[in-house]
């Protein structure tokens, strides 16, 4: 319930590194608001529109920056490198202009400064939000989590998601499953990890390394009485799948981008492959590796059915 007010906290805890994560959490909290309440509509629209726009711009900049960084190892020709620099500069300029237009930064003489104006606008929108009771919120979240799990399972079993496409298939699937962990984290103590490893169907994921990972922790809120649980092993398993698919996808998109760029500058595919070395991963391999990971978790291990059953049990 009051977790939505932590949007204000998130807005004041932006990090130079991994700054998309707070924006994902802001979007998650906005998506959880009741759209049937008229007073929520303005806040939802403002928060989603702005946070999604900035997050997309940062994503494009991150990709351009990763290519530029990678080229320190790949050492493509000056012609290719110059194009990489142009792409990086364009992404940086687009992000900067976006933040200027939104009032998040101001441009002075030879300096970029933080500006409160854009954040004050978002915070003003929060004043209009109507919150459910803590008990009602728990039920709504459990139902949402269960529905997400069942929908994802159905999408794969009935092939509603085309996994032969990297961006519109594999990456879209990853986006969908990632919301579960983002919701759980953004709710700041409303969702906690279960503590029954002996009966956890994902108990093989309950390892010291997973338990110690900063990405696998959820806040504890002693004041929250109507909590719900996420299977501990299931949360770790989901995180592992998200991470694996992200690595596979990034490698594939990097190869695809540099293949297009390199060949446009007269390089042969073999020369590009040689430059990339172990970072080379063609489309077929990307699709194969990602599909194997997805099918194993969804079809063989029935991962989302198990997660859905756990949430369903708490609705009883």
Question: Each PLM stretch: what is its role?
Answer:
Residues 1-316:
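Function-determining surface determinants
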